[in-house]
Design a protein with these regions (language model features):
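Acidic, metal/ion-coordinating pockets
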Residues: 1-196
């Protein structure tokens, strides 16, 4: 399913994708409660993606079972990920996600604005946008002295070509705390890029 862009993805120094679907098993579903077949993960791997972001508004579409199954399949596939975890102990061991590539050490963070009204149930963890948690994660990342801290934020409003006030304010705050790069997802359209 990635045949038309596989070459570009596989040639990237680091290919990060937003896994905005669960791998929750049958029955497979589309909008508004997504669940993809397991073969989708193999297609992602074959396309050359290195990292998947899992904190997004669809990560709980198949509930606790779907999220845990997705994590289990990601773990068995060898594709690294950030954003959702089976429990707090697993999150502490794996997060922030550190990547060493071409002589650079990168700390990767991932958060979502929400999960479409479905709450994560204990002991599962979804990285929601929460300044206290994010600040702790940034401090944890800084302690390991990365060359860059990238925050991948699932935020904003769908089909809006400009970031809203809340996105801009949070972006400013993230940069003030030491994040060096911010990548956004969720709007389903391309929003502007800004260099500071």
């Amino acid at each position: 399913c990635f045949s038309l862009i596989k070459e570009q993805i596989s040639q990237a120094d680091l290919a990060i994708g937003n896994l905005e679907v669960t791998l929750g098993g049958r029955p497979y579903r589309g909008y508004p409660m997504f669940s993809a077949p397991d073969e989708y993960l193999q297609a992602i791997k074959d396309a050359g993606f290195d990292i998947l972001l899992t904190a997004n508004n669809h990560c709980l579409d198949r509930g606790k079972k779907g999220m845990e199954r997705t994590i289990q399949l990601l773990d068995s596939s060898g594709i690294r990920y950030a954003g959702t975890y089976k429990n707090l102990s697993e999150r502490r061991q794996r997060y922030p996600l550190f990547i060493n590539r071409n002589g650079f050490r990168i700390a990767l963070l991932n958060y979502t604005y929400g999960t479409n009204g479905i709450k994560a149930t204990s002991p599962n963890i979804v990285n929601y946008i929460d300044k206290n948690t994010i600040l702790q994660d940034i401090q944890s990342a800084k302690a390991r002295q990365p060359d860059a801290i990238i925050a991948c934020m699932h935020w904003g409003e769908e089909y809006q070509s400009l970031p809203n006030r809340e996105q801009r304010e949070l972006a400013n705050w993230l940069l003030q705390q030491g994040v060096t790069h911010i990548i956004g997802s969720h709007p389903h359209v391309i929003q502007p890029m800004e260099l500071r």
